[in-house]
From Swiss-Prot:
Gene source species: Tetrahymena thermophila (strain SB210)
Domain of life: Eukaryota
Comp. bias regions, Basic and acidic residues: 217-230
Full protein name: Tubulin glycylase 3E
Span of domain TTL: 911-1250
Key word ATP-binding present: yes
The gene coding this protein: TTLL3E
Amino acid sequence: MILPFEYYFLNDADNSSKSNYNNIQFINENQNNNLRQKPKFYPNNQFLIEQEQDKYENKKIKNYISDQIQLQPKNTPINKMNHFANINNYQDNKFSLESLNQAQQDNLQKEEDLSILSFDSQEELNYLQEGEENNQFLNEGDIFGYQTRYTFFENRNNLLVEDATNKNNNNYNYNYNNNNSSTQRNYDFNYQNTNEMLQKKKKSNFQNKSQSQLNNHKNEEKKPSQQRKEQLMKRFESLSRIYNKELSQTVTNGWLKPSQAKTISQDNNLGSSAAKSSKVFYQQQKPFSAQITNSSLKYAAASNGFQNLDFSYKQKQQLIQQETKNKIKEQQNVESNNRISMKPPKSANLNSYKNISNLKNFKEIILTRPNSKQVKFQQQNSVNSQPSSLVSQPLKIQSIEKNNLNSNLNDQNFYDDFAELGSTETTGFSFQNVFQLAGVPKDFIASPRSPVQELNQKQENRENELDQMLNDHHIYVASSVTNQNQIKNEQTERKPNMFGKTLTTLARPFSKEYSNRKDILKSAQQNVRFNKNLDYLDSQNKVVAKNKKRTIFKINQNNLQGNQKDLQSNQTSSVISQQNSIQQYGDDNYQQNQVLNDDQSPLIKQNSIDLNAAEIIQNDENENTQKENVLQQKKNQSNQIVTSQQQSNNYFKQETTTNTSNFSTTSNRIISLQALRQKNNSTVKNSDNNNQNQTNPQNQNTNLKENNDKQNLKKTKIQSASANQAGQSNNQLQKTFFINSQDEYVRRTLLRMGWKENKLLLNNNFDLKWIYIDSNDDYKFLNDNQFYNHFKNNTELTQKGRLLYNLKNNTQFGVNQELFFPRCYDLGNDQERGEFSNEFNRMNVMNLLKKHIQYIKLRRSQTYQEIKQAYQQKQANKLNAQVKDGIFFAKVTKQKFFSPLMYEDTKRDNRFIFNITVIAEAVEILKKLKRQQEEYIDETRQSRDCQLYIYQTNFKLESMISQYVKINVPFDEEKFVFEKIVGMSKEHWSSPSMKLMKKLYSLYKYFKDADPQFKVSGTKNIWIIKPSANSRGSGIYLVDKLDEAIDSGLKMQARIVQKYIERPLIFQGAKYKKLNNKKFDIRQWVLVTSFKPLKIYFFTSSYLRVCSQSFDLDNIKILSKHLTNFSLNKNSLAKENWDETVVELKDFISYLKEFKNIDYQEDVKPKIKDLVIETIKCAADKIVNRKKSFELYGFDILLDEYAHPWLLEVNLSPACSERSSFLTEMLDAMAYKMFQIVFKQNNLQEDLEINKETAISTAPASCQNPDYDWEEIYNEEQKEYFCEEDNNMQLAFNNDIQLMVIGQKADLKKEKNLDKKYFQYWGAIKIQSKIRSFLAKKKLQRLKNQKFTFAAIKIQQKMRQFLAKKQLNILKKQQQTNINIPIEDFNQVSVIEV
């Protein structure tokens, strides 16, 4: 049972140009369950297959294949499925399903064409199927499609072929994968059974044939002869050697005309079968072959068989060798005197020889190659001479293995191989010779679509491209003598040139113009290299030139102040030194301009900036000295110096003009050798003239004395005035800044203020540095006069974990962070993780209380009013507290034990039902929390650290409360839902009493007043988890379960959890446009210019960030409903609607006044200012102050439904994308006025702005808006106290201490009274404690002494009773015996005894 096509099929061949391997698709096993369904008569415990099973399976396979073929379009190219269909339907082909066995996977290459061929007779087919001796031929024949079975796999869309023919085994193993189970059923059977099955299936495949035809067919089944075997082997070797990828280029879109197929078949002795088969395909509009691959062309696949192929491989090989030998002899006869070695030139591309497989697989091809020695010999004789006729020697190339058929026409190395093979001068190089040697027919080579024509055309295009490159890039030509030496010394080296490639290979070194082009390229490389070296040396020369100039100017000043004799003697040296300095300055400027025009390295630009700055400072220092020297010296001396400078300047101008003119002319064209020589001669003459002028200073002196004194004085005044103007302009342009962030508004503002940007990253030449995030290394390399937009240790405010730590520590200074910062915990700390779990459970109890009170308030308003009035009256009549002498004495009540019956009374409201068990437990927990909170000194502080020990003893009630709170159904239906979840019986549900409801209201009222976050915390118990250091909303998510929050803290330590404000301010109504039913927060800019003393500025305007989706607490997984970060919300909006995520402050103020009747300027803004001040003060001591540093912070503030501000986080370098027009205006105004404040405090305002008019002209138009301004909200001025007398003995440790007086002056009388009262109360407490202990001990001693007396009294009482009874019994006996005793005597005796 064989199922080769049941699991896989091919897609419709839409892309016919692609390979067949890309059209493979895996079939889902569930799509063909009917094919894999096991028949009913399958045996369970047997491994033999009966005839009925084979027929059943084969019918299914044939029907499935035919259905797949019908689904394909008619004009699609022949793919694998078409071949498989032809196997079953084509009568001449004797394949059967059983013959499609697996072929070896190791012998298959990915890019080989797997085509199916027909055979001459059935005997050839049987010859391939039978016997062990033919297995080798089968393995070798896999390249041409002698595979016996195909299976398709999805691994990289490649088709793998496995060999099913085992060399020493005749057994066959088959695997059948059942769809319903993963077990594999292996069916093994003998070879005899397979022969019987083959015969049965052959009958089914040829049902249309008569019985006579089948008998004739069986008689024809004979093994082929030995001669036929040899022909098949030779056919395989010849086709694998000759027909390759180049031949496949002739086929246009897979088509081949019959005439071309006929000529090809005749030239190669392949018979007429190729022409016949191609004619049939061409008429039926079918492709020439299944697919022409990149590795080789399968001509046998195109011709659909090896029919009538009669030729001898040895004869063909001999003909090829004779042709090559004849060509070699002809070349040797013509040029026998010029034999050279086989060694290729060094300039050739040697890497291409490694890939010699590009020359294809022919066994021995004799090629020619020029020798590098003769090239050297000709270059030594004359550079302009071309290489003469070169004699080539044969070069034998070993045959390559058959499997190495991977070659690409698009590969550049392929063309380099042919270009480097070379040729003689007479014949020239051509690809025709190579293809002829390979055995390609001449008619095919001459055709216009042959690869030979394409290769020749590409070679010509490469030559044209080289000529164009030489003309476009302006390569200079050096002298012939230097070129000869360079070629001699550097011929063996391969160096990259200015084009990024090796132009020696592009120049085709064995062409006619090889020598000239090689000289041009070598000279171009050296000229470019020489120019680069000069440019890189400029930076070092400029530093040396600075020092020379300073020394020269000092020498000139000393000479001018000296005597006349000294001036006359040193006149010549001073003039020469000045001329040299001016020449040097001119050369530096000329080189600098050349560097800037060519866009050289940034290092040279940096040095030029430093040079200009040094020159400006030097001119400013020497202005006054030059004026004084000119007035003091004599007229002749001043005339001489001025005229010498003028002459040197004129000379410098002439020299620079000649240099620039030569440079401009040479940049437009390639100058010749004569032009270079003329230029060199002209420069030599100019240098000679220059030396003559320098060596004859007397002639200059005579000309200098002839000038007038007045004209010289006017010229000096004009020069000094122009220098002053240039100095002022240079001073304004000296201010530079460096920016490395996305804040474009900062760049615009500084450029508007006259600053220049320094774009060099590794450069410290700037006056202001603006970056996104700072590092500790930045502060090490900063100078004292450089501005920086950060303070060291600013993470104390901007990191969420550090901000939490600083705010908690700030409570000891009287700041209650619970009023403006939601509860927050660090999940990386074990202690705070435990506090968070307690807080989470506490919030569940609080939410339970809120839920019941809210239900009573909404559904039973009358009952709620009664409870409220009773609570107010109870608080008014409370007389258990008294105040004496300012001391509060409270009545202490005993703790009552928990009992649900204590809240039962006769008054009940039967209209609603509560879970009395859960409510009573919650009330007891709230009472304990209340007592623990009242024990704190600060009553307003929230009791967060209290341990809820009741949860540890009764964990079941804890889970019940948490589950009861999370029920999100109407209150009347909670009973039924809660019973299903918890499983509590109906006995726990009953209507609440008035006493219970009053107790709930009193607890609700207490926690509402004591807890500032009680109103905004909501009833869902949602918490938000944030990474400590991330920004822009990354890594943030919301949770409502304790386990999720704690697990996130254990996995990632740098995380905090913060209480989510469930009741924010939400506007409802279409008139509010962007804010309708959406959450928002406020981004407030704050500027800090100093931390010691602390100076805080508050920007008067701000903007609102709005969520892109409506607010919904039931869906906490969609972050765009809860977070306002633009980086998260922009993905859910189109780019045109990005402005919906931002709202201007003035619109919000009007909405707030209309919706809540709240004034933002009076009610909200002052609270935000206090929030900012307290937040910055908590970390001010830990941030390092710097004089010229400043910091811009972004405070994110959220308003609850009562318009109370809450701090969410503080952002470092707040990012603001300019997605609205008002944002750009506000940013420009904010940045401009921010820099005005920063520069004004550091006395830089005068340098930046000369007058008010220029300041107004440079300011943006938005600065005129009064709403856009900075307001100083906190200024902690530093107060310094000094002694009236000089104190020279100042201590060292007092230098850095900053003391400040806080509070009022001390009153001594009040202090004394307070001390007396304190000692009195303290003494009374001590005395009382001693007396109480004394009295207690005395009482115990008294009890110990009295216990003996009590015991004696008890014993006496018992004894008396016993004696009295005994005496009465005696008297009774005497009366019975008639003994008369007087009563008086009896009484006396009894009394005495007693």
